[in-house]
Amino acid sequence: MRRLLFACALTIASAAHADLCATGRQQSPIDIAGARKSALPPLAFAYTPAPLKVANDGHTLRVRLAGAGELRIGRETYRLQQVHFHTPGGDKVAGQEFPMAAHVLHKSASGQLLAVVVFFRLGAENAWLGRLWPHIPARADGDHAIAGERIDASGLLPAARGYWRYTGSETSPPCREGVQWIVLRQPVELSAAQLAEYRKHFADNARAVQPLNNRTILESP
């Protein structure tokens, strides 16, 4: 009887998650437009090199970076967790779509999730991605520790640190809301060959933009 009740509870929870993805009012990604200028604090990235560990989860390439530094925003501190990639880029800017974006995920001591978005545009070869792409696992079979390789997430970031901020959600089920999103305004570059290589493994793995539903988008100086 207890096992049956547990199975029923799981079914109800799964249905609730599916409903949130479809009916949530603070979902991500969004089309960033009409942002309000605000005296937002600067982003203080304090990332450190870490052993390279990657995973193909069947949906995206994940780079495991737990313990590899933190991001401080005013009095808030968020520990780096991982980086993964979407193509196309998910969030748009005034209707403009980017060919790819990186989501740099963080978590505070209280469990608050925060994602930093780095957009990519086509251009020169990206040296940071050049260290990752040769190690994309061919199939979803857990984490792969790359012997002798270390990586620093700082190498992914653009030089300018202006950003937009909004409250959104996870972009895949269960689509939990309350996630803080930091979208860096300056894109970085990747080559057409690098984009094509990623898309061999994970094509069209971005969620469509979601309604803003009267949320406020803030823009830093």
What are these regions (language model features)?
Residues 1-4, 95:
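Positively charged n-region of N-terminal signal peptides that target proteins for export
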Residues 4-5, 217:
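Small/flexible residues
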Residues 6-13:
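Bacterial N-terminal signal peptides
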Residues 14-99, 103-221:
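Extracellular or lumenal secretory-pathway regions
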